[in-house]
Amino acid sequence: MRFSFMLENLSKPVIVTGSQIPLSQLRSDGQENLLNSLYIAANYPINEVGLYFNNKLFRGNRSIKAYADGFNAFDSPNLPPLLEAGINIKLIEGKISEPVSLPLKLAQITPQPIGVVHLYPGISVELIKNIIKQPVKALIIRSYGVGNAPQNQAMLDCLKQANDDGIVIVNCSQCIKGTVNMKGYATGNALSKIGVISGNDMTLEATLTK
């Protein structure tokens, strides 16, 4: 969630919420999500950008849309919820914050040409070449497991040339849980040697924003 990177020195919570069923419908989850978000913001001031859905408050830049048609619409694969709201409200990863006296900083985020490549067996090097021929400033590789890629020297040469040309290349796993470790296997280590940066456990959305 880009707000997490745009708003610095927050002195109050910013909570984003919504609904899976439109608010105009009788069974909408929107009213409960909104009321709980307001109550939590007023009484449990976790001064960061959060996402509240279905009784859970997630860190904004750690959350992903996980379900298309369930009330558990969002998840945070690599970080427990900040807070859970049941009969009682329970802090988990969240911490009640003291107000800060620093002025709010609003970082400007402008659209950037970024390529995303989802690796698969037999992927053509020409496909990657065509992407980096465009005026891209960065390339995100969706790799296997802990950051592995096909053992393809032509692809490595292509990525190395892109890195030498100033294109930032980040390795993000296709897995939603766990972290990239390019030292774990030879194929991942080969990416590291040509200058590919580890995305660690960031979501694709957070990587694109950064």
Give residue spans per PLM region:
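Short amphipathic alpha-helical segments and helix-helix/interface helices
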Residues: 4, 38, 128, 156-160, ...
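C-terminal non-catalytic interaction/assembly regions of soluble proteins
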Residues: 146-210
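Accessory alpha-helical/coil subdomains and C-terminal extensions
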Residues: 59-146, 151-152
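Short beta-strand segments
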Residues: 15-18, 50-54, 118, 142, ...
